């Protein structure tokens, strides 16, 4: 029976390849992918705890400033204000969240790295066009910081080869927006991840982008994690590697 099923599957797949339905129906691929990822997201949400952590689900309207409540909660819960941390932020823009973490942490051994093209999005994202959200390097007076300008795909390999980021508590803040950028960052840093590392997402509940990238990454690399906080219906979410 199993052999028959395998042969039938192979035969049907061959027929489909021969007929090439993608020539006529490819326009459906993006909306179908969105529906698939949205269903995965809602299933994921149904399994997340809402007690014992900061989690405001459900709320009818989003307040982007509440992301700072998430940062404050994480900092207080894990005593990060005075700990030695390596903070890596991907998608700095004007440096608002980057500056918050620099000001909050007082440990002189901590290091803060901000990655961005500073020339805007490398590809379109939702209603944003390629090149939107460009900004100048933020002016922050602190010797512990360093900005890495360029595409993540061009800069991150060289950075990990030349910088030690395995000491202290590692905080990875992903505000990359895009599926491609998010997946690249996660897979590149996979070999560095260790227990208790913290990963924060700024647009996590966007089905086809940060959520999809995180789902593919954790499933492909067998990464175990737990949710440690979320605001704005999981738009901003934080996880700890376990």
Summary of predicted features, one role per range:
Residues 1-61:
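Membrane-proximal basic amphipathic "stem/tether" segments
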Residues 48, 52-57, 72, 76-242:
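S-adenosylmethionine/decaboxylated-SAM
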Residues 58-70:
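Conserved SAM-binding loop and adjacent beta-strand
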